[in-house]
């Protein structure tokens, strides 16, 4: 069934690592520049990557991810939103809430935290030298759906009273509350990746 694979992003090989670990196609939103080179374009297309123009914005990217999950596919996502640009650890940055917004569209779909360790040893940003012998490790934690996280007292803690309060608000108030939930889910996901050892 569908799932969201969420991991840290320190190297160009991170998507490949997730694809190999999943043993079934994993789709990613990839910037259009990755499709400019014919060889790279063929690789991206053959592995199910989705070409995304920067100017379509977050809503357009989310719509494409929704299509993947709606058809029962695996959607890979990097909660940080981009590859880490830091030259020294810690590389893990604050997450963007796109992962939570996507998970909220499919509240029963599992979000699988995947910490990728050692990817920078294979190929580091700005370094064209590839070390094919470097060890890369993927540590996977228990999946959690957005719906389960919302109901969990250690997560969103959305009980019956909170639901009533949420429904009593106008649209602006509801959006404000949901933004807080998205931020909370994302922050806990990033903290899970850190706990798993993501550098």
What are these regions (language model features)?
Residues 1-57:
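Catalytic core of membrane glycerolipid acyltransferases/transacylases, capturing the structured
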């Amino acid at each position: 069934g569908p799932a969201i694979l969420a991991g840290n992003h320190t190297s160009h090989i991170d998507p490949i690592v997730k694809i190999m670990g999943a043993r079934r196609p994993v789709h990613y939103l990839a910037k259009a520049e990755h499709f400019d080179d014919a060889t790279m374009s063929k690789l991206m297309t053959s592995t199910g990557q989705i070409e995304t123009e920067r100017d379509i914005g977050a809503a357009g990217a989310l719509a494409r991810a929704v299509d993947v999950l709606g058809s029962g596919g695996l959607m890979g996502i990097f909660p940080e939103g981009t590859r880490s640009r830091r030259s020294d650890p810690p590389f893990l940055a604050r997450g963007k809430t796109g992962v939570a917004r996507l998970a909220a569209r499919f509240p029963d779909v599992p979000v699988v935290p995947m910490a990728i360790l050692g990817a920078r040893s294979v190929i580091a940003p700005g370094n064209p030298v590839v070390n094919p012998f470097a060890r890369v490790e993927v540590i996977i934690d228990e999946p959690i759906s957005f719906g389960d996280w919302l109901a969990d007292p250690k997560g969103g803690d959305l009980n019956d009273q909170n639901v009533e309060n949420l429904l009593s608000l106008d649209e602006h108030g509801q959006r404000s509350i949901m933004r807080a939930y998205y931020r909370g889910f994302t922050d806990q996901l990033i903290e899970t990746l850190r706990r798993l050892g993501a550098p």
